[in-house]
Protein backbone atom coordinates (compact mmCIF):
# COMPACT_ATOMS: atom_id res chain seq x y z
CA UNK A 1 0.00 0.00 0.00
CA UNK A 2 1.35 3.43 -0.94
CA UNK A 3 1.15 6.21 1.64
CA UNK A 4 2.30 9.82 1.93
CA UNK A 5 4.12 10.47 5.20
CA UNK A 6 2.98 13.55 7.13
CA UNK A 7 5.70 13.28 9.78
CA UNK A 8 9.05 11.50 10.00
CA UNK A 9 8.66 7.86 11.02
CA UNK A 10 10.48 4.54 10.72
CA UNK A 11 9.05 4.21 7.20
CA UNK A 12 10.73 7.40 5.93
CA UNK A 13 10.88 11.19 6.02
CA UNK A 14 8.11 13.78 5.96
CA UNK A 15 6.39 14.36 2.56
CA UNK A 16 7.83 11.15 1.15
CA UNK A 17 5.76 8.57 -0.76
CA UNK A 18 6.54 5.07 0.52
CA UNK A 19 5.28 1.54 0.01
CA UNK A 20 4.30 -0.22 3.27
CA UNK A 21 2.17 -3.21 4.18
CA UNK A 22 -1.57 -2.60 4.51
CA UNK A 23 -1.60 -3.65 8.16
CA UNK A 24 1.26 -1.31 9.11
CA UNK A 25 -0.46 1.55 7.31
CA UNK A 26 -3.93 1.08 8.81
CA UNK A 27 -2.94 -0.08 12.29
CA UNK A 28 -0.02 2.26 12.94
CA UNK A 29 0.65 5.05 10.44
CA UNK A 30 -2.97 6.20 9.99
CA UNK A 31 -3.89 5.87 13.68
CA UNK A 32 -0.82 7.84 14.79
CA UNK A 33 -1.51 10.49 12.12
CA UNK A 34 1.89 9.83 10.57
CA UNK A 35 0.60 9.21 7.04
CA UNK A 36 -2.30 9.64 4.64
CA UNK A 37 -3.31 7.22 1.86
CA UNK A 38 -1.78 7.84 -1.55
CA UNK A 39 -4.35 8.94 -4.14
CA UNK A 40 -4.69 11.71 -6.74
CA UNK A 41 -6.20 14.25 -4.32
CA UNK A 42 -3.52 13.66 -1.71
CA UNK A 43 -0.82 13.72 -4.39
CA UNK A 44 -2.04 17.19 -5.45
CA UNK A 45 -2.03 18.22 -1.77
CA UNK A 46 1.58 16.99 -1.45
CA UNK A 47 2.67 18.94 -4.53
CA UNK A 48 1.09 22.11 -3.10
CA UNK A 49 2.83 21.61 0.25
CA UNK A 50 6.20 21.00 -1.42
CA UNK A 51 5.76 24.11 -3.59
CA UNK A 52 4.99 26.27 -0.52
CA UNK A 53 8.03 24.86 1.30
CA UNK A 54 10.21 25.65 -1.73
CA UNK A 55 8.92 29.23 -1.82
CA UNK A 56 9.61 29.68 1.91
CA UNK A 57 13.09 28.19 1.47
CA UNK A 58 13.87 30.56 -1.41
CA UNK A 59 12.58 33.56 0.56
CA UNK A 60 14.73 32.71 3.60
CA UNK A 61 17.76 32.15 1.37
CA UNK A 62 17.21 35.54 -0.33
CA UNK A 63 16.90 37.34 3.04
CA UNK A 64 20.06 35.63 4.30
CA UNK A 65 21.99 36.70 1.19
CA UNK A 66 20.83 40.31 1.63
CA UNK A 67 21.93 40.26 5.27
CA UNK A 68 25.26 38.74 4.23
CA UNK A 69 25.99 41.62 1.84
CA UNK A 70 25.12 44.16 4.56
CA UNK A 71 27.31 42.44 7.16
CA UNK A 72 30.33 42.09 4.91
CA UNK A 73 30.35 45.85 4.28
CA UNK A 74 30.55 46.56 8.02
CA UNK A 75 33.84 46.99 9.90
CA UNK A 76 33.46 47.12 13.67
CA UNK A 77 36.13 48.66 15.87
CA UNK A 78 36.67 48.28 19.59
CA UNK A 79 39.24 49.55 22.07
CA UNK A 80 40.70 47.33 24.77
CA UNK A 81 42.83 48.26 27.73
CA UNK A 82 46.30 46.93 27.17
CA UNK A 83 49.80 47.51 28.44
CA UNK A 84 53.28 46.85 27.18
CA UNK A 85 55.13 44.25 29.23
CA UNK A 86 58.86 44.45 29.95
CA UNK A 87 59.62 41.84 27.30
CA UNK A 88 57.89 43.95 24.60
CA UNK A 89 54.68 41.93 24.32
CA UNK A 90 51.32 43.71 24.52
CA UNK A 91 49.23 42.34 27.37
CA UNK A 92 45.45 42.74 26.94
CA UNK A 93 43.40 43.13 30.14
CA UNK A 94 39.91 42.48 28.79
CA UNK A 95 38.18 40.83 25.84
CA UNK A 96 35.36 41.28 23.35
CA UNK A 97 32.48 38.84 23.58
CA UNK A 98 29.54 37.99 21.34
CA UNK A 99 27.36 40.28 23.44
CA UNK A 100 29.61 43.28 22.67
CA UNK A 101 29.54 42.55 18.95
CA UNK A 102 25.76 42.03 18.85
CA UNK A 103 25.14 45.25 20.81
CA UNK A 104 27.37 47.19 18.41
CA UNK A 105 25.60 45.74 15.36
CA UNK A 106 22.18 46.54 16.79
CA UNK A 107 22.95 50.05 18.06
CA UNK A 108 25.02 51.41 15.17
CA UNK A 109 23.72 49.42 12.21
CA UNK A 110 20.22 48.31 13.26
CA UNK A 111 20.93 44.62 12.60
CA UNK A 112 19.58 42.03 15.02
CA UNK A 113 21.32 38.66 14.88
CA UNK A 114 20.97 35.57 17.05
CA UNK A 115 23.96 35.14 19.37
CA UNK A 116 24.22 31.44 18.52
CA UNK A 117 24.95 32.32 14.89
CA UNK A 118 28.39 33.73 15.79
CA UNK A 119 31.55 31.59 15.61
CA UNK A 120 35.06 32.34 16.96
CA UNK A 121 33.82 35.21 19.07
CA UNK A 122 36.10 35.50 22.08
CA UNK A 123 38.60 38.15 20.97
CA UNK A 124 41.43 39.10 23.31
CA UNK A 125 44.16 40.28 20.94
CA UNK A 126 44.97 43.61 19.35
CA UNK A 127 44.55 43.73 15.57
CA UNK A 128 42.07 42.56 12.96
CA UNK A 129 39.85 39.54 13.63
CA UNK A 130 37.33 37.72 11.46
CA UNK A 131 34.02 36.58 12.92
CA UNK A 132 32.00 33.97 11.03
CA UNK A 133 28.22 34.41 11.23
CA UNK A 134 25.98 31.48 10.25
CA UNK A 135 22.96 33.11 8.66
CA UNK A 136 21.10 30.17 7.10
CA UNK A 137 22.13 26.57 6.45
CA UNK A 138 25.12 27.02 4.11
CA UNK A 139 25.13 30.84 3.99
CA UNK A 140 27.84 32.41 6.14
CA UNK A 141 29.05 35.99 6.44
CA UNK A 142 32.47 37.17 7.57
CA UNK A 143 32.50 40.23 9.81
CA UNK A 144 35.76 42.14 10.31
CA UNK A 145 36.45 43.38 13.83
CA UNK A 146 39.33 45.78 14.44
CA UNK A 147 40.67 45.90 17.98
CA UNK A 148 42.85 48.84 19.01
CA UNK A 149 44.83 49.60 22.13
CA UNK A 150 43.05 52.04 24.46
CA UNK A 151 45.45 54.67 25.72
From Swiss-Prot:
SUPFAM superfamilies: L9 N-domain-like (SSF55658), Ribosomal protein L9 C-domain (SSF55653). GO terms for molecular function: rRNA binding; structural constituent of ribosome. PROSITE patterns: RIBOSOMAL_L9. One of its GO terms (cellular component) is ribosome. GO terms for biological process: translation. Gene3D superfamilies: Ribosomal protein L9, C-terminal domain, Ribosomal protein L9, N-terminal domain. Keywords: Ribonucleoprotein, Ribosomal protein, RNA-binding, rRNA-binding. HAMAP family: Ribosomal_bL9. This is Large ribosomal subunit protein bL9. The lineage of its organism: Bacteria, Bacillati, Mycoplasmatota, Mycoplasmoidales, Metamycoplasmataceae. The gene is rplI.
